[in-house]
Each structure stands twice: as C-alpha cells, then as structure tokens.
Amino acid sequence: MRQAPHRLIDICDPTEAYSAARFREDALREVELIRDAGRLPLLVGGTMLYFRALERGLSPLPSADPDVRRELEREAQELGWQTLHSRLAQVDPQAARRIHPNDPQRIQRALEVYRLTGMPMSEWFARLVDADRLPYRLVKLVLAPGDRDVLGARIADRFHAMLEQGFLEEVKALRERPGLGPDQPSMRSVGYRQAWAYLDGRLTRDEMIERAIIATRQYAKRQLTWLRSESGAERFDALSPTLLNKVLKWLDGISCLHQTDL
C-alpha cells in the first residue's frame, strides 16, 4: 500500500452504516478524480456486491421500513437468526446461499425486501438497470488461488499476524466508544465479532481464533463462488510463480485500450 495511493480506506467511523449505494457514489467520484489527473484507476477488492453495484448500477430497492425491521428483530429474539435464515432460504434461495446464517444485518434486509414487495431480493438485483451502468470499459482480472489448502493456511497465518500486530487492543479501544456495540454492522464483520465475544468472556482465546479463522475461510469460499460467476473476466492462479509475467503478457495482448477504459 505504500507503493501506490489508495482511496476509500478508513473513510467511515465504526458507528456509521455504509451501503452499496453510498460506495457507488464515492467510487465514481474517486474514479473521475483519478482520470482527471491523467491516471488509470485500478479497482481492487473486495466485496463483490459493491463491485457489481458499481459496474451495473443499483435497482430501486425499497427503503428500510422501521415496523418491518422491528417485527423481524422480535422474531429473531424468539427464534434466532439461523431460523430466519432458513425462512429466507424458502423465499429466496439465491440470497440465502450468498448470506451467512450469522449475518443478521443482511438476513434482515433480504427478508424485509421480500415482505415489503413480495419479490426476492435476488430478483431485484437481477433487474439492475443498464442505463445506470458504469460508463467505462472494465478490464477484469480475477486472481484466485488454485490450491485451497494454501489459501486456508494463509488465512490462519493472517489472523495470527493480526493478533500479533495489536488487533485485540484495537477492539478493546472500540469497546470504549459510546454508541458502538456488538450489534453495529462494523462490529459484526469477520474477526471483530469473534474478538468482541472473547473480550465479553463468551469465548476462550483458542475458540476466538478458531472461529475467526473458520469464518474467514467461509467468507473466502463465498467470494470464490461469486468470482467464478463473474462474466468477462480473465482468471489467473494467484499462486503461480509466473503470475506477474502471465498477467503482463495478457495485458499486452489487449488491443485498443481507449481513454474510457478502466
């Protein structure tokens, strides 16, 4: 990250909610600024739903309804979010496959959309409006590891490195923040959720580490599934020792990269 300027990192307070719609606005603004400076933006990530929103635009999903949300929260308190996830699987199997059973924010939103409209959220996403597509040509590269065992080991190494670099101290400091609790979207993300439970005394250190690593591996699996369905993308084995040469050769072979390309 020291070798090139990065945008849209550390732009929100942990108490703030962040959406795909807001990301699209922020990303389009940064793309224009980079192009105005005569540079080529590289979009790197990440959360595939956000990338798809940037590329294709957003369907006009209904706004949040406080009454429906309160109803869903009451049901979750009585039955548990995993039961609500099972209900989601009945009305929107595609969304249920994409959303983890321990992700109450997205389970709630998907069920809310269905209850408000009678239409599954996945169908809303399928109706993304072409008129709002990204007004550039995208050159898409997918870098995915060919060996899942290596990926799993690197995920474990990464979390251990995070702990060594003060991750728990970061979460302890966040716990002192007013208005920030374990139900905030930022604190339900992978790693933070398990660390918070450990600091609450609900998990041992070993349990925290194991669950955080498992959750990260599950997240990586979902990302790889999404990447396999990404159309118009060139795929490379991220573990190949000749990866750089292969990518550069492929880029050299792309003809007529216009000024409107990304």
List PLM regions with ranges.
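Phosphate/pyrophosphate-binding catalytic cores of soluble transferases and nucleic-acid-acting enzymes
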Residues: M1-L262
